[in-house]
Design a protein with these regions (language model features):
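Conserved NAD+-utilizing ADP-ribose enzyme module
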Residues: 1-6, 18, 36-93, 97-214
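A structural/positional concept
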Residues: 1-31
């Protein structure tokens, strides 16, 4: 735990707050399961670029993926198709490790109110360590000279603790990175249904408001 910050952050749509309190944090894949979305509609949402912010049949909202055009992904993916990358990131719950990245995402959400969950990392690891992974890049952005990426981008937490980014650099053919290179994202595969037991603080952000240091 000494190699991770004491807390991480999750930015959620304020409209989804009742669902989060009931069911915890769910990946897009899990949200589609919960809402009963199937067939071609599900395929479009889960395995292609979402150009619009969506409201599912149960009222839960799913954000667009405008920074992830398929053509840009095709140029930077290793051993994967764009549809597979969309499926991979839609199967995970994402956390930011610093407020600057969170605030950049918040700006991309425009005027929609947001809720920030501040998460205790020690509690998160205790509950979800076996399903946690770390990424050194913003996996949801492929604009402006996108970084090479693939399945190895998400390094399992236990592996990262022991050997840093070595599996990513080997798997993607990258230059070896220092073990101290900070992660950009922390992910939990599938869902984090009891995330409220890991929450230390909650911030409600009105339209245009950013998260500030305490």
């Amino acid at each position: 735990l000494r190699t991770l910050p004491a807390r991480v952050y999750h930015l959620a749509e304020a409209a989804n707050w009742p669902s989060i309190r009931r069911s915890g944090l769910l990946s897009t894949t899990a949200l589609l399961d919960q809402a009963g979305v199937q067939g071609n509609k599900r395929e479009r949402i889960e395995r292609s670029q979402r150009l619009q912010h969506l409201v599912l049949p149960n009222g839960v909202q799913v954000r667009d993926q405008k920074p992830l055009p398929a053509r840009a992904l095709a140029a930077c993916l290793v051993g994967m198709l764009p549809s597979e990358w969309y499926g991979l990131i839609n199967s995970q719950v994402f956390f930011w490790l610093d407020m600057d990245r969170l605030n950049r995402q918040r700006l991309a959400c425009g005027s929609r109110p947001q809720v920030v969950l501040v998460i205790d990392v020690e509690r998160l690891v205790a509950r979800y360590g076996e399903r946690m992974a770390l990424s050194r890049i913003n996996s949801g952005n492929a604009r402006r000279r996108p970084a090479r990426r693939g399945r190895c981008t998400f390094v399992p937490y236990r592996e990262w603790v022991n050997s840093g980014w070595s599996s990513e650099t080997e798997g993607l053919g990258l230059c070896l990175r220092e073990r101290s290179h900070p992660p950009a994202e922390l992910t939990v595969a599938g869902d984090a249904t009891d995330i409220m037991n890991c929450v230390t603080d909650i911030h409600r952000l009105s339209p245009g408001e950013l998260l500030r240091s305490p």
